[in-house]
Amino acid sequence: MGFQVSPGVEVKEIDLTGIIPTLSTSTGACVGQFTWGPVNYRTLIDQETKLYNTFGKPETNTYVSFFTAANFLAYGNNLRVVRVANSASNNAVSGGNTNALLIANEQIYEQTYYTGAGTFGEFAARYPGAKGNSLKVSVCGSRTAYASNASAQAVLLGGSLNTANHVIGDAKTGNTKIFLNGSANTHVKAGDWIHFGNTSRGTKYKVTFANLTMYTFTPALTANVAANTVIQRQWEYYDQFDGAPGTSSYVLNKFGKNDELHLIVVDENGLFTGVPGTVLEKYSHASKASDNKDDTGTSKYYPKVLFEQSKYIYWGDHDTNGTNWGSEALNTTFTDVSLPRRLSLNGGTDQVVTAGALQLGWDLFANADVVDASLLMAGDADLTLSNYIIQSVAEVRKDAVAFVSPPRSVCVNNIGSEADDVVLYRNGTVDENGDVVTAGLTSSSYGFMDSGWKYQYDKYNDTYRFLPLNGDMAGLCARTDKTRDPWFSPGGFNRGQIKNVVRMSWNPGQTERDVLYTSGVNPVVSFPGEGTILYGDKTLQTKPSAFDRINVRRLFIILEKAIARAAKYSLFEFNDEFTRAQFVSMVDPFLRDIQGRRGIFDYRVVCDTTNNTGEVIDSNRFIGDIYIKPARSINFILLNFVAVRTGVSFDEVVGKF
């Protein structure tokens, strides 16, 4: 305690209740190509519905990534997904194909485009990809744009302007086109609703095309329209809102006016919902004033509203017909634009994902201090990427296992050669001189390989597809964590049942299983009446040891991660008897609990002067030695049946054979 120089009471609180924390070991990680969603950003997904809503429908180039993630979610509910994209992929924009660009995620947009550089037009799709070309944005920036009267204009009969006998007169029943004679059309836009006459009652017509001299509409006229008839127009989406935009109370109190606007986002081509024209989002009474906030302090400035709330678009620039948009409210009059904006986005593209992009995506999981991920699913990764995930992610983290599958070519429609080719893929090949011709998968206790692909129904496209099993393998581990503990083997008839299998690409028999298992490949086998089973629990470690089994590897991941996390609170304390005893009293109950849950046979914790010598203390180090006898899973069962004569005592023969 500090030295007090006058009487007083000083209260101190010392916390000596430190324990080993509980850790999650069921967090999956998946990197792949998708049709929609943020790029190079870790997104938490807890169910398949959210996966679909966030990353879009599985398609030809994306279904493997989608179902690898979806298959994991059939067993677990904690998955981090990273979408990767080719650097040549673009977001759809309202400024035309030549302005298309890649905005990978919210961070990139906020750092580069949020200030309104105006390099891509007024709006951009939230994420890159051709799917963004289905989006349409309509903005109603004033009361006039919401609804207005077009001035009386002479109308011509529907038909072709090249026809010589057009005269000023009535538009007849059945016409779907009107030519304007006199003042040019500056009041009606494609998409608007129109009525003829001084009333909004009666038949309503949808304008499908409009220019300065003519517009077409649907349905056809149900009655004659006389020349010089007044046209009543309404914004295309007027009925989606409670009234016209005007002046917000915030701006009114700042002596400004005309700051409100309505904005709506539509699935124009139906790629998001399957129904063209479906309204996706609408924003009512948003503001053009950059400082406008509601009573709760939430911004109403429409670029910020879109940034914080929209799932489909970003703002890029203001309507060029407006003035003062984006200014602060004080004494500001915002332009009363006469017509709404109707902007179809285009220029969005998808490109084939490169190996480099996939590796960069996996780099987002390499730092164990930044993100928690225990089960890494490789999808249809090739040999190079599979080794990268094992060596540069799992082994660097030291708290995760990478699950890989053989390539489709060696286990689908490769009848009779599957086992040999899978083993060649796993081990690589050498020539007659012993020189390596092709490298195989690295030897590592942080890697796990299955034997094939499964045939599965794709409900989104009403078809069947072959899919790698590594998503299911990781899922079995997540389910084992939930039903038992991480140190239980995920294989076998009790915990190794695989879901959503129509059939396997091949079904290894006993001889083939022997070939696979000796090379560290875990067979997946369909048994009549039993289902499809993971029939192994080996890691990719070639060296025979306890760590060539996944349950032991995951046991030590738990022990190392949990104890290390608790031990960091001993940093900068004194290496004395008290600190060492505190460490032992924290670790011992944790290991005793795991022993009681069948994870270890026995253990010992040594943290005293035998390993914390004077030299160790003087070098500012602290050593705790933890000895573990891990529990082993049963891989082989031998049943001996011995026939004994009636007169022979069992004591004479037991243990003799």
Language-model-derived ranges and their functions:
Residues 109-124, 130-227:
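Autoprocessing Asn-cyclization modules and mimics
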Residues 201-205, 271-280:
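Surface-exposed loop/edge segments in extracytoplasmic proteins
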Residues 7, 13, 94-109, 125, ...:
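Charged, amphipathic alpha-helical segments
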Residues 224-235, 255, 262:
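Surface-exposed interaction regions enriched in Ser/Thr/Asp/Glu
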Residues 276-317:
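E2/UBC-UEV (E2-variant) core
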Residues 1-102, 107-115, 119-122, 126, ...:
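Structured, hydrophobic secondary-structure cores that serve as assembly/anchoring elements
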